[in-house]
Amino acid sequence: MKVIVSADDTGSAKEVICNEGTDTSKQNATQPISIDNCLLEPSSSVKSRIIHFLSFNYQYLIGARLGGQVSVYELSDEESEEKFKLLHNFELPVDAQDKPVALLRVEILDSILVAFESSKVFLIHINDSFDFKPLELVLPEYKPISAFAINPQAENIVALGGKEHDLQILQLFNKNINSTVFKKNNYENEFKPQIIFKAKNVRNDHLELRVPIWITNILFAKAAKGYKLVTSTRYGQIRLYDTAEGRKPRKDYKVTEKPIVTLTFANDEQTEIIVTDTHSLIAKYSLTQVDEKAFKTISASAGEIVKPVPKLLGKFTGGNTGATFGVHAYERIVAFAGLDRYLRVFDLESREILAKVYLGVEVSALLILDDEDTEDEETKKRKRKEEEDDEELWNQLDTKKKTHTI
């Protein structure tokens, strides 16, 4: 397995190569094949640490950094002399403390979107010469955002939200546009974001008080009509939206008392999600099965209040403590890392822990580059020696056969 993780303490990253069964907390267990520092350029500083990773066409590794830098690295093979060579560094005009909330690929445009907390959004066309000037998309409203997502079914559609900024869906450009648009002289005119949906808040609580809004994550789900979305909040809620049914959430569930940090689909059917919070929760929930009386709270005025929640399918346990910020589900595995400085890799279906590696740094982002086990150098040398011995044996047999023939 090969995973790259951000190193928040230094502003660089680490490449971890390990196999199933790796556990650095046990002296007699399998140890990582390698843990190498990388992405040291353009500068290694906590003030420009990497917040998001993206693999672009399996050709480039892109990192969105605090303060507006977007670094593009070469995704080279293991035998390359210089791994993750810096190819280009875009510098976006944002404040030094402005944090990227999303780094997304727009396949139909051969481009990426970078969204910041300040509500600034940039479109960058990725070509071989990296000579495209980032285009700032002027949003209809400028409110701070905490979440930004693209619709995989229609990449001209995005959704955003944040603190007291309820869910909005926007159209960034016409659906018929593709990457040839950048050949036009005034291509900027093709990108005029428009709000096409504004959500309404849930009804007041049992005390008739307004429920506060603070969206932390957004996922687009598959939809035959309109748009379906899943959101998480700073108040531990999971909400399901269907624009074909109205502006309010179709379902509103409380799954934790802590702020939800990440939200990830756990299967291709999009019927399961993985949630992490600021404490130690890493859990898988069903979106189709509901426990009607799973969440209980006591109110001085209303007594015991019972609410339904998505069925808990199980937790990913491996001694994790503190918030988990880096999450990536890929093929059969899922990887986690965060404040406790450990990388943990699990089987996505069974939740069995496959690898546990101490990193020595806090992590904001990670990306699985390969989910298969990797041979270490000793194994490679042994196999090469066996192949050479086999070849020598066949050569000897071939020589004897020719001698007998003569």
Swiss-Prot record:
Lineage: Eukaryota, Fungi, Dikarya, Ascomycota, Saccharomycotina
Annotated gene: NSA1
Protein purpose: Involved in the biogenesis of the 60S ribosomal subunit.
Keyword Transferase: no
SUPFAM superfamilies hit by this protein: WD40 repeat-like
Protein name: Ribosome biogenesis protein NSA1
Region called Disordered, residue ranges: 373-406
UniProt keyword annotation of Iron present: no
GO cellular component assignments: nucleolus; preribosome, large subunit precursor
One annotated GO biological process: rRNA processing
Assembly description: Component of the pre-66S ribosomal particle.
Subcellular location: Nucleus, Nucleolus
